[in-house]
């Protein structure tokens, strides 16, 4: 079964750089709305892992999952305090979050089944189509379309957008 890993920082550090939204209440509302979206998207089920690295209480999200859940969409939660300094940037913290999630939920992750990492506040409107049409036996599935200056041709930029990325 496919796994959706929804990453979150509900209450970001006051010194976190480059945040467009820092209010925990607003962020929590967006995380809740996105979680409900993934719980109610039509089609076959998937396992949802919701992982927050700001040690924020997840009662609101647990309640949303209980009220909108399906038997074929189990949801598992983890909230912990990140040890990565905010000054190191969002990317470094997110990599640590992914590592923590994969380690913590290792028993729930079927071997060689894809994990779709999604920024937890975002609703990927075509997630069902992406999951249903993913290439067989892929290792990494990422979006390079909307990232400017990718590759050696343009100054060696090898960045990709990691709001949605899948891996096995």
Which residues does each PLM region occupy?
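ER/Golgi luminal nucleotide-sugar-dependent glycosyltransferases, focusing on the catalytic module
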Residues: 1-168
């Amino acid at each position: 079964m496919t796994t959706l890993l929804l990453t979150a920082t509900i209450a970001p550090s006051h010194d976190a750089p480059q945040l467009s939204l820092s209010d925990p209440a607003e962020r929590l509302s967006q995380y809740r709305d996105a979680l409900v979206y993934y719980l109610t998207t039509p089609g076959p089920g998937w396992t949802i892992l919701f992982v927050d690295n700001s040690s924020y209480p997840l009662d609101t999200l647990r309640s949303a999952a209980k009220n909108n859940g399906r038997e074929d969409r189990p949801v598992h939660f983890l909230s912990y305090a990140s040890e990565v300094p905010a000054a190191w940037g969002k990317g470094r913290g997110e990599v640590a979050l992914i590592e923590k999630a994969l380690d913590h939920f290792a028993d729930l992750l079927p071997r060689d089944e894809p994990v779709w990492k999604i920024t937890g506040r975002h609703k990927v409107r075509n997630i069902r189509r992406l999951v249903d049409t993913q290439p067989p036996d892929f290792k990494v599935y990422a979006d390079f379309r909307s990232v400017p200056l990718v590759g050696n041709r343009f100054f060696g930029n090898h960045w990709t957008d990691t709001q949605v990325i899948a891996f096995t």
